[in-house]
């Protein structure tokens, strides 16, 4: 059984270490999160967004596609293909908040993953970039 132990401060988790037996579960979760992010970004690109956002989303989609392929190889199966793209807000401010929420979740998974698998630290850097972009957009 995979059990999460954390030393908590008043603000947030100071240190989270997952035992090695959690690796498969974490990789499976990250695969699902990356698939969700990829489909949401694809749907977002079809909306009326500012030009700088469209450029970022195009690069972001490439990043997510690469992460997804990497995780599919690691877990030994492909993520489930969606028949249609998810519905996302049409107004950019609401869409930015939705994307920020998904990316913030992905960042938390990436932190856990990088602590367990330092060889995957580049994914953490990508997630920090994505979160940073959407943080700036919603401020």
Q: Which ranges hold each PLM region?
A:
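Non-heme di-metal
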Residues: 2-139
